[in-house]
Structures are given as structure tokens and as C-alpha cells.
Amino acid sequence: MNDTTLWAELLAYGTGISLSPLHIAVLLLLLGPKPVVRGGWFVIGWIVTALATVTLLLTVGHTLVLDMTQGSDHRTGLDLLAGGALVAVGVKELLRAFADGKNPPGWTRSIDRFVAMPLPLLVGLGAISEVASPDDLVLFAKSAAVVLAAGLPAWQEWVGVLAFTTGASLLLLLPLGAVLIGREKVLPWLEKGKQVLFAKGELVVSAVSLTLGGYLGWQGVSSLLLR
């Protein structure tokens, strides 16, 4: 795998994590009271959690000396598991989108309650939610696996971790940055973005999950064919 492909994969896996109902929570925080404080701390908690999780997985991989090269048992198993999990999530979100029709998804009510929580609880639950879902966990694991397989020196591993974290945080950082520059100017755009995500969020998550799941499944099958 060349460097360009590696960084592209890490950004893609990170983006898959950032596309969740929690990134809609940031829009709601920025539309509510104390937007910079509450939204800023939430995003900081998200970034720290992403950095800590992928760093921990890399440390475990180095300690156990796991072989993550293409065609190895560990890599093939992870690719097939991750691909299957993401395809399952994509199909579930697609079916849910059709079932909801024009009605707001059921999780929108949970998001409204979530963003009304006290700030420490909000940040803590956001961090837990980031690593609790199976689809996010397989993306964290896959990101650590491709870095391990590349056999990079330590400083380049850190670049890889930062690339992944950037992808995982980009959709949260963009609206926060826009509010820091000029909240009044971007409020209509944030409100419009919230409405679009409430209406189409499940379809977006489904498309990304199916795309990444199909790619990882193809990698797993390719590894099996190499044997």
C-alpha cells in the first residue's frame, strides 16, 4: 500500500465514524445556549477519545506482534468482520429510512434529550457513545490495522493517527469553526443543516456504511483468494 492510499483509507475510516447522530448533536449544541463552550468541550472530548482509542489499539497490536499484512489470518478476519458489520449497519439504516418515511427518525428525540444534559455528563456520554457502537469499533480497529501493516516508523504512525482523527472529527470541527468566525452569519445554515440531517441522516449513514463495508468485504475476500 502506498502512502497516498494509506492516508486516504485513514481519512475514509475516520469519516465513517464522524457520520453518526452525534455529529448532529454538535449542530444542536451550536444552536443552543453557550454554543462555543458546550460545543467546544464536546468536540474536544470527541477528539481526545478518538486519539486515545486508536493509540491504545496500536499499542496492543505492537505488544501482541499481530500480523496485519494483506492475506494474514488476522487481517483477513478483521476485514471480513468489519465489512459484514458495516454492511449490516448500512442495510439497517436504509430500512429504517424507508420505514420512517417523511417522519423524523426516532433517534432525533434522543438527541434532543442528550444535548440538554449537564456539560460533564454530555462530554462523558459522548465519549462513551463514540466507542460503544460495533460499527465504530471495527473502524477504529481497521484504522489501527492498516497503520500496523504499513510498518511505519513511530513518527509516521503518529501522522497516521492524526489523519484518522482528522477524518473522525472533521464534521464536528467545521460547524464549530464557522460559529467561532461568525455565529450570526452561519445560524441559518446550521438550522438548515439540522433539518437536512434529520430528514436524510439515515440515508447518508447507510450510503457510507455500505460503501466502506463493501470495500472491506472485498479486501477480505481478496485475501482468501490469495491462499
What is the predicted function of each stretch?
Residues M1-L19, I44, W107-A132, Q156-A163, ...:
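Small-residue-enriched transmembrane helix starts and helix-helix packing motifs
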Residues T5-W7, H74-V91, Q156-L170:
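Alpha-helical transmembrane segments
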Residues L10, K34-L64, A141-P188:
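A small-residue-rich subset of transmembrane alpha-helices
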Residues Y13-G32, V36:
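N-terminal signal-anchor/start-transfer transmembrane helix
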Residues S18-V26, A132-S143, L172-L173:
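Transmembrane helix boundary and interhelical junction motifs in multipass membrane proteins
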Residues P35-T108:
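Membrane helix-loop-helix hairpins that form the core translocation module of multi-pass transporters
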Residues V89-A132, P188-Q195, A199, V204-A207, ...:
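Alpha-helical multi-pass membrane helix bundles of inner-membrane/thylakoid proteins
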Residues A127-V146, L212-R227:
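Alpha-helical transmembrane segments and their membrane-interface junctions
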